[in-house]
């Protein structure tokens, strides 16, 4: 997504409020979350449910993409809130982003905590919730097990029920 495309998307987004639920395609446009976040004027924390870290450096210049929008947020935007990514494999954690304060709840932690009452919810609260700022939640559908929802990306292990329970209990 180059600068001209970003401006086109921003123009389209103006007619929608930042508060609420935004459904954006099947996962190819998760990077548009960064544009939504740029419209929020008050401090907030971010929780991202995703099977991928979305923290890759751009392959083609300074282009915003689904593979690197969280890196853009942390490195370039002056974002001061906490960022927590839920669902990524432990082997795919970006060490540089971890050093910059991004927290991760891995696929392995989800499996370990599965079945424990409030296990994952407590993990999420401990890692990211300050109680001082609102929380923006972004869900990439590829965090879900493919039995729950089929995307065109490799997928995670969460059920829809797990995802909703975590969001409701957090």
Predicted regions and their residues:
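Conserved alpha-helical scaffold segments that buttress catalytic/binding sites
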Residues: 1-170
